[in-house]
Amino acid sequence: TMLKHYKIDLAGKSAVVIGRSMIVGRPMSYLLTNHDAPVTLAHSRTPDLRRFTRTADIVIAAIGKAKFLDATYFDAARPPIVVDVGMNHDENWALCGDVHFDQVQGIAKAITPVPGGVGPMTIYSLAEHLLPAAERSLC
């Protein structure tokens, strides 16, 4: 994963995964749990979502709502690592994520951009696994 690539130790880091889909949200919560990170699985209608995001060490955004998480969801005194998995269009039809990048980049310890963040990593991972899978299917 991207977090592993940058040698981010997940053990003991509080994580909030926003989005409960079977494609991203739930698998990501399992992955983080398997690396000893306590995880809160939330969604866009979680009551007082800011209470969770403002105290988290890691925030994974996968809710499918353009620029949903703005600066008010984060605490500059406790900067999180923010992974934006969202792929949306804003009001001008420009690609954007679930996180309002321009507002949050000055608050977050690290943040993935959209486009250019998680998307290329996904393509790389698919390509990395495609050849071995094809080789196995030919045997």
Give a label for each model feature.
Residues 1-81, 93-102:
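Glycine-rich phosphate/diphosphate-binding loop of Rossmann-like nucleotide-binding domains
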